[in-house]
Amino acid sequence: MPTGPLCALLLAWWDEHGRHDIPWKQARASGQPDPYGIWIAEVMLQQTQLQVVLPYWQRWMEAFPTVDALAAADEQQVLLLWQGLGYYSRARRLHQAAQQLQGQPWPQDLEAWLALPGIGRSTAGSILSSAFDRPFAILDGNVKRVLARLTAFEQPPARHSAHFWDLSEQLLDRQRPRDFNQARMDLGATLSTPRQPDCPRCPWQSHCAAYAAGSPEQFPVKESPKPLPLQVIGVGVVLNEAGEVLIDQRLNEGLLGGLWEFPGGKQEPGEDIEATVVRELHEELAIEVEVTEPLISLDHAYSHKRLRFVVHLCGWVSGEPKPLASQQVRWVMPGDL
């Protein structure tokens, strides 16, 4: 692979057409961008597109402008500000990492960043190159797609992570790693998009094996889709005589850790959904309820499963609510939710 010409072509394209207005990439008075802002942005970008992240990042930086401010924040404040971005464990790990980084110099090597909660190899490489102009490779979705097309790789990239990391390391401009990594991401985000890649404007068109084959949109090769399993969740909106509803806070570990919810759980095989609600609320909160009327049914899909939430209104019969499978429980007025 002619890495020298490829690097020169991409950087020349990026100098003229790249996304130069990303706020966390802007230099401060010192001439360098803020490592804190870059770290926050890179974690937000792990599962979320740039245009979605931008307003969240702005609000975050206003609320927690420094590592010290984030470290001192209450976890519920952190989760509330993250609300809407999803994958809430990212916010919790940022909070934990801030408490580790507080009062310390910024890490300058890959191993130190990987030792922090919520930081993988690509995120660490992106922080080191973006914040400190260090020559570390990245391999996010955009870069993986660009490399798969450049080489017309005939297998799903997820099965060949080591191969793509080798390619990314080989194809890294060590004189301008900050700009080059951003250029790779910009190329994937603006020209070599998942659908309808804009090959005529691509600086790598003459070197691209997928373009030469006449089918760039067929790369990267996709895994055969597997049907997602469906789980039905019975949920109870429990009312007491004061008109309050019962909510509980999930354990920190696992999906949606630390968030508040109406209580409920998985339907067992052969079980009526009303029986699911009664059983789950007894097992998890030590209360007895009467299921009265259905309220709503909602479907939601994750990458690995589908969930159907079947929600019923319930009357509180007996038992003082206890957090047997959660952090805490609380009666609140509906207007305070």
Describe every region a protein language model picked out.
Residues 205, 215-261, 290:
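N-terminal strand-loop-strand
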Residues 201, 247, 309-313, 329-331:
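Conserved hydrophobic/aromatic beta-strand scaffold that supports enzyme active sites
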Residues 134, 233-234, 327:
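Short loop/turn microsegments at loop-to-beta-strand junctions
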Residues 262-296:
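The catalytic Nudix box helix
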Residues 313-337:
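NUDIX/MutT-family hydrolases
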Residues 225-228, 253, 298-309:
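Acidic pyrophosphate-coordinating catalytic loop
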Residues 4, 13-200, 204-213:
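Catalytic cores of DNA base-excision repair glycosylases
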Residues 5-13, 239-241:
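Thiotemplate assembly-line natural product biosynthesis machinery
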